[in-house]
């Protein structure tokens, strides 16, 4: 019982440690050029082939790229780049549709990163579009 309580306390403490991204960090961010549509399609399709059981026939809708920051864990240093958000509905092996899932693809100067929106307990601690920050 003590172990469970300590684990819960530790998890809550880490969540409370979410440090906000500062205006200074945003102003000093080095962004790559906006990705071309061909680069976006290549990255999304490569991810789908590795992540889905039947990557041949997914339905996908992707929003245009926007400047953003993201981090997998709320206390990590944010990565700045261009974010593309895609809603993907894969086909089941039986032929039926699976549930729609949202994935985020971040194009940075240090490579590309993929995030599953469902994995964030509070998405505002993990992702933010720069045009929404005042």
Locations of the language-model features?
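Sec-dependent bacterial lipoprotein signal peptides
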Residues: 1-18
């Amino acid at each position: 019982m003590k172990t469970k309580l300590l684990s819960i306390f530790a998890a809550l403490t880490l969540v409370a440690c979410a440090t906000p991204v500062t205006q200074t960090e945003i102003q000093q961010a080095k962004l790559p050029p906006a990705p071309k549509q061909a680069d976006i399609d290549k990255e999304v399709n490569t991810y789908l082939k590795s992540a889905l059981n039947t990557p041949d026939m997914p339905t996908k809708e992707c929003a245009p790229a926007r400047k953003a920051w993201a981090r997998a864990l709320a206390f990590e240093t944010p990565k700045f780049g261009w974010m593309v958000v895609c809603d993907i509905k894969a086909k089941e092996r039986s032929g039926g549709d699976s549930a729609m899932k949202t994935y985020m693809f971040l194009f940075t100067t240090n490579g590309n990163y993929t995030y599953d929106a469902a994995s964030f307990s509070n998405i505002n601690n993990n992702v933010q579009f720069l045009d929404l920050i005042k």
